[in-house]
Amino acid sequence: MTASHSDSLVVLFGATAGAYGAKLGSDERELILLVWQVVDLPSKKVGTLHKSLVKADNLELSDQCREVSGLTAEGLGKAEPLDRVLQQFIQLVSSDLKVFGRNSYTLCSDGQLLIRQVLHPETSKKNFLLSDCFYSFYDLRKEFHTCYPSSAAVKDQTIKTMAEYLGLGTDEAEEDFGVWQVKTMVAIIFSMLSENCDHIFTDPETVKYKYETGPCSKSETVDSETVIRARGLPWQSSDQDIARFFKGLNIAKGGVALCLNAQGRRNGEALVRFVNSEQRDLALERHKHHMGSRYIEVYKATGEEFLKIAGGTSNEVAQFLSKENQVIIRMRGLPFTATQEDVLGFLGPECPVTGGKEGLLFVKYPDGRPTGDAFVLFSCEEYAQNALKKHKEILGKRYIELFRSTAAEVQQVLNRYMSTPLIPTLPTPIIPVIPPPYTIATGSIRDCVRLRGLPYTAGIDDILDFMGDATADIKPHGVHMVLNQQGRPSGDAFIQMKSADKAFMVAQKCHKKMMKDRYVEVFQCSGEEMNFVLMGGTLNRSGLSPPPCLSPPAYAAFQTAAVIPAEAALYQPQALLPTARTPQASAAAPPAVTYYPAQAAQLYMNYTAYYPSPPVSPTTVGYLAAPPGAVAAAATATHTPLLPQPGALVRMQGLPYNTGMKEILSFFQGYQYAPDDYNGLIQLSEQARSVLQAPKEWVCL
């Protein structure tokens, strides 16, 4: 019952149980009031004015709502629920249109919020469909500014300011809440239809019915004013789930990009691109709205970030994704010998693949070796659901994982495997290297505390305020903010205290104390436990669990942390695997970062799950005075000359499968590898990596 140019408008006004005006819908409160009236444009006549209360699931009203609307929870308790009210709305509008001999209409609302931020999100959460008429509407503020260009900007308009501009009455006390608003909007429309303006309603706003998938090229230009980052998503959420979270807003085609971590798994974040900046600004108002039981954080992002995640250059991927409106399923764990026929046979006739073999995309390494991943296209949701039922069924001798995917995830996975260089290049070190002025804690004395569950926006000042009087007991440079692999706050921090007693007191006093809107857990720990957590282990009041990179035997007894030279810290942590040194050797070494070595009899992949930010102390932010002479001593300190460090390990990723010892030694020509050790190297081959073993120490390349 809609058209691009209708003879009738339905002026619509609504209110929720929470915020009013410019913040309507920003607090997720439910709709409690709808008021509407039909306006016949050719005859300039109006139909009956209707007002309906809506019974919300939560009848608690905000103070602002009670004050502005005059409504009570008792009155709303007798009203009909939203789905019944919307049915009545359709029936009453149809009856009013028959009086004027019309059969089509378009909604007209005061701004975008009622339609986009209230009606669409709420009906989506309550799992019922809106009528087609709610997918097209006129924004009275935009139409007014088009008719009267000298009026205030669209974002500053209200019903009252528009009425004042036209010299109309603005005494709201004369009418019930909602009735005055609709009558005034009708009067504004009639003024716009007068001979002086002769305004024509021809270009309505539209709401997309569903999210459209599609590829994104790295050569595209993406406006940074149209991109947001959503954080805190359930790991199993798909692009359709995210589109549903932003229901009512127009997402660009292929505009949902789920982010992956270094292991290729989703990290709970997504970048979303909208059709324009206005839609993006409305999306930012959904900060901390809920997806199920989880609240989702929404922040601004840039076009470069979106292209980095969603953009691709492969013609094969572009052709695969060229089939629009397909459901994408990712298969993981395929046998390396699996063929297209094997995959089609595994899926079976109950879930036919779009285009047969053309609907399959195998992920391969640059040299053509399969990775065990594949993407599959299905033409409808039913076929995709049938495929997902085969999750962890057996193909060959392996179980296969199946889960929903997106066009952006296809690009990310292909980019990750296809763009790996044969010999990764590390950043050129700065000469001379300036050692960092701090050392990460080691030792078994439990003089540290761990803060877990910090707000992502929390800074050093917030942590020091949180600790209160205990700030005076923090060691110099003893505040360590922990960052994740994307360089963002992880919600953790480590604090080095002056003694174990001080750490115990802080843990007892501050545990589950509130910081902003979150409670923070505080655990006492040692420097060794702190480093274990940084490597991926877990620490809570039940104890410490080892990181996945260490075996239980390696965890059975704490070792002295290995020390690598300060200049090595310029490289990415994944590129360095140091061995342990004797206490005598490390005592004279320059300041260093800390890792844990593998056992003498075994080699485990040593990686860092989190990275500590440069630590600070209360002295650096003005909480405590620095010790006398500390600044002068730091300024006059001489840097230790760089000396060869025995036992350092260097990791090389992406080696060609047929790389020999001669090629590796040639690559390191000039780095003074001891000639006596050449004969002691033994090459161990595996499909994904190469390891060189020396008789006296491990070397991982």
Curated annotation (Swiss-Prot):
GO terms for molecular function: mRNA binding. GO terms for cellular component: nucleoplasm; nucleus; ribonucleoprotein complex. Residues 226-303, 327-407, 448-523 form the RRM domain. Signal peptide: none annotated. Its main location: nucleus. One of its GO terms (biological process) is mRNA processing. Coiled coil: none annotated. It is found in: Nucleus. It comes from Gallus gallus (Chicken). Belongs to the ESRP family. mRNA splicing factor that regulates the formation of epithelial cell-specific isoforms. Specifically regulates the expression of FGFR2-IIIb, an epithelial cell-specific isoform of FGFR2. Acts by directly binding specific sequences in mRNAs. Binds the GU-rich sequence motifs in the ISE/ISS-3, a cis-element regulatory region present in the mRNA of FGFR2. The gene is ESRP2. The keyword Repeat applies. InterPro entries: ESRP (IPR050666), Nucleotide-bd_a/b_plait_sf (IPR012677), RBD_domain_sf (IPR035979), RNaseH-like_sf (IPR012337), RNaseH_sf (IPR036397), RRM_dom (IPR000504). The keyword RNA-binding applies. Keywords: mRNA processing, mRNA splicing, Nucleus, Repeat, RNA-binding. CDD domains: RRM2_ESRP2, RRM3_ESRP1_ESRP2. PANTHER family: HETEROGENEOUS NUCLEAR RIBONUCLEOPROTEIN-RELATED. This is Epithelial splicing regulatory protein 2.
